[in-house]
UniProtKB/Swiss-Prot annotation:
The IMP cyclohydrolase activity resides in the N-terminal region. This is Bifunctional purine biosynthesis protein PurH. Residues 1-144 form the MGS-like domain. The gene is purH. Its EC number is 2.1.2.3, 3.5.4.10. It comes from Listeria monocytogenes serotype 4a (strain HCC23).
Amino acid sequence: MKRALISVSDKNGIVPFAEKLVELGVEIISTGGTKAAFEQAGVPVTGIEEVTEFPEMLDGRVKTLHPAIHGGLLARRDTAEHMEAIAAHDIKPIDLVVVNLYPFQETIQKSGVTLEEAIENIDIGGPSMLRSAAKNYAAVTVVVDTVDYDTVLTELEEHGATTFETRQRLAAKVFRHTAAYDALIAEYLTNITGETFPEKVTLTYNRKQVLRYGENPHQDAAFYTEPGTVENSISSAKQLHGKELSYNNIRDADAALKIASEFTEPVAVAVKHMNPCGVGVGENIEEAYLKAYEADETSIFGGIVALNKEVDAKTAEHMSKIFLEIIIAPSFSEEAFAILTKKKNIRLLTVPFAGSVKGFEKTSVNGGLLIQASDSVIEDTASYEVVTEKQPTEAEMKALIAQWKIVKHVKSNAIVVGSDKQTLGIGAGQMNRIGSALIALEQAGEKAKGAVLASDAFFPMDDTVEAAAKAGITAIIQPGGSIKDKESIAMANKYGISMVLTHVRHFKH
């Protein structure tokens, strides 16, 4: 290796890296701020303009876009015609390229960033050099990540060159990196234009964790996250204690967070297998947790609990009495943290809460991807329609709205029985609505008397209303829209139940 081109925005570790290259007899070519950093550190360096014999122009937009650079990168060393061509133009081969790109992601995440600032942080020369070097990885080593500096130096010291396998791996890394960089720019500009579903979608995610296994032990898995911070998201969670999250932990935590984010009042949500098993609302977080626990004392064991307020010592004392996989909250008091961390394996996570989840959901199918707006429609309760002779009381209406927030997060067909303070019975994922209703009512038992019932979709028959009435339900909330709505309304009137239609369906598959 004789010649290296180095141009980086992230200068961490670059000076000692270059110093070692010089010790190994490598000539350093550099640009702008990187060149200045080398000169200040006393590292021998050749300016890019000395190689191209052309000055930087357009405020630095054009520096390395020159045949003297790309010819030196792309020339195949095993092809005589290539080597003769660059020699004829006095172009020297470049054997190592170290480049990281303008911080576009960091720029667009700044508060108040302008379009002009974003545009100026779109790197052109950097990706071009990286791609040229990566294409010719048979002869050229290309580095885009500071973590690879040591590998390159070790191989140079031991062999005088990098191995083919290392060059190939680094080239693949470069193409992933530039593809992700371009995808981020495309997404940013697409959002500005207001296009919702463009003809092509390129998604970029960063690997956060290689998981022990997936949903089952025979399935390999990893966790990838979107660039930047996403509020109300497990991807932005900070783990304070406990062992690593599993695949199932992450999915359950995501489900719990979505429900907890629906409420502004203190709420505790217990989840098992992506369905809530108990949700409690209270004047304070202790009361909320106790209501969630009482909702289903059996299923909460080994579950995940999400709370939308700081966990205090009293709440922590209650939670420490049972086995919980994960507790998620905006924060933990010092006393609560001390109590909970006595359990070695419990995972404690903090997540920033900021209202219900918005944006888009992505679901893979075999050979494709479904994208839809999140089910975060803002519903105006004033538009809800009471269709029965009996009007819901103020207390019943409060309970109906609370359970309506919950039922949208239960796998369809979904029925939730509850009060204004807690769920009492949850029927999830049955192939017919009456099946889910019977499960929820059976779970609620005697507590169903005086409770309310929420259904994520309309009643195809009046059987659910009749079953609810016989169990003691006093009010029902559902979207309506069935051709047999009149029969369900008539059944409600027969038993003196109030029924509210929201005209919004909340299927969850």
